[in-house]
A protein has these predicted regions:
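Auxiliary Fe-S-binding modules of radical SAM enzymes
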Residues: 48-151
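Conserved non-cysteine loop/helix-boundary elements of the Radical SAM core domain that shape
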Residues: 1-22, 32-53, 73-86
Length: 151
């Protein structure tokens, strides 16, 4: 479990207050953070959080671990498993189904850690981004090779 130092509600309220004050916010989420057992819950919780926050910008990275990191220790000990590329895409699809903010939000998933680059505006472009992800799930050749993923 990742300790962020804030609760979900505190993070949402903080973003809402900044946006209400006219300060645009940019928030980043990490795909794969919950591992294979909890990826669906993580996707839904993240998507609904995006919807409730109403941030101006949202970006998505894919989990990669570098030392020193307790999660890396857990991975080496067999206590944590990474999502497969297909699971990361499925998690992102599910997240996008729930990421329906009430005002337009710029969405980017173009970090070097990601298997697929996405760009669009939530919620208007959700369906197109989901379609793009599903196409990539059917053709693994469209995914970024592991050698080119980096932090």
């Amino acid at each position: 479990m990742v300790q962020k130092g804030e609760t979900r509600e505190e993070l949402i309220l903080g973003v809402q207050k900044l946006e209400a004050a006219g300060i645009q916010t940019s928030v980043t989420f990490i795909s794969g953070l919950a591992g294979p057992e909890l990826w669906q819950e993580h996707a839904i919780e993240t998507g609904t959080m995006i919807a409730e926050m109403n941030a101006s910008y949202v970006s998505l990275l894919t989990l990669m671990l570098q030392p020193p990191c307790p999660m890396l220790d857990d991975y080496k000990a067999g206590k944590f498993k990474f999502l497969t590329p297909e699971e990361v895409l499925a998690e992102t699809c599910l997240l996008l189904q729930y990421a329906r903010p009430s005002k337009p939000c710029v969405f980017r998933s173009n970090h070097a850690s990601n298997y697929v680059s996405l760009r669009g505006n939530l919620p208007m472009d959700n369906a197109a981004m989901i379609a793009s992800l599903k196409k990539c799930m059917q053709d693994r050749g469209l995914l970024k090779d592991e050698r080119f993923r980096m932090l």
